[in-house]
């Protein structure tokens, strides 16, 4: 039976009732002692609460940074697409204005379209490569963060265990 009780007398009552009902045996007294130690040490409670709050803030900050990065990348891609559309329209206008020979213009148009298709294909390949690299870096960063957080938590638990063992 595990509980995190803010009122030690209520916890004691819960443990006693559980003992009477046969749910808790020898561990009941240990749990009462642990709860009482936690209740007596408000400084320790405050440190644990602060650590939890700092961890939550850090996670929120990491998430906002990632969202900001994604938004900037989308805006850059949109601006690049708009620039390409403007170039295309300007080229079309010049072709219509300078159209002397119909066949020559059609050939130039086809050549330009082929060039644009190749550029778009190359750009798409490059964007996919960059996206894959970005996703991999994000995964590595998140994995490293989780490993560090786990190690910090483990060392904090060991430290708390040693401090409680001295009592």
From Swiss-Prot:
Residues 1-22 form the signal peptide. The modification Pyrrolidone carboxylic acid is found at residues 95, 119. One of its GO terms (cellular component) is extracellular region. Residues 23-94, 112-118, 139-167 form a propeptide. One of its GO terms (molecular function) is toxin activity. Keywords: Cleavage on pair of basic residues, Pyrrolidone carboxylic acid, Repeat, Secreted, Signal, Toxin. Expressed by the venom gland. It is found in: Secreted. RLWRNWE repeats lie at residues 34-40, 61-67, 86-92, 107-113, 134-140. Residues 147-167 are annotated as: Disordered. Its main location: secreted. Belongs to the scoloptoxin-08 family. This is U-scoloptoxin(08)-Er5a. It comes from Ethmostigmus rubripes (Giant centipede). The lineage of its organism: Eukaryota, Metazoa, Ecdysozoa, Arthropoda, Myriapoda.
């Amino acid at each position: 039976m595990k509980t995190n009780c803010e009122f030690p007398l209520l916890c004691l009552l819960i443990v006693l009732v559980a003992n009477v009902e046969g749910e808790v045996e020898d561990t009941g007294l240990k749990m009462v002692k642990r709860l009482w130690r936690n209740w007596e040490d408000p400084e320790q409670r405050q440190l644990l609460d602060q650590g939890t709050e700092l961890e939550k803030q850090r996670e929120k900050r990491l998430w906002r940074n990632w969202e900001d990065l994604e938004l900037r990348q989308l805006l850059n891609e949109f601006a690049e697409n708009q620039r390409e559309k403007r170039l295309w329209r300007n080229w079309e206008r010049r072709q219509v204005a300078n159209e002397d020979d119909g066949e020559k213009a059609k050939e130039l148009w086809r050549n330009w379209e082929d060039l644009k298709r190749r550029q778009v294909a190359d750009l798409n390949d490059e964007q996919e490569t960059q996206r894959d690299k970005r996703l991999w870096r994000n995964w590595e960063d998140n994995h490293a963060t989780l490993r560090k957080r786990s190690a910090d938590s483990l060392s904090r638990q060991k430290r708390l265990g040693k401090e409680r063992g001295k009592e």
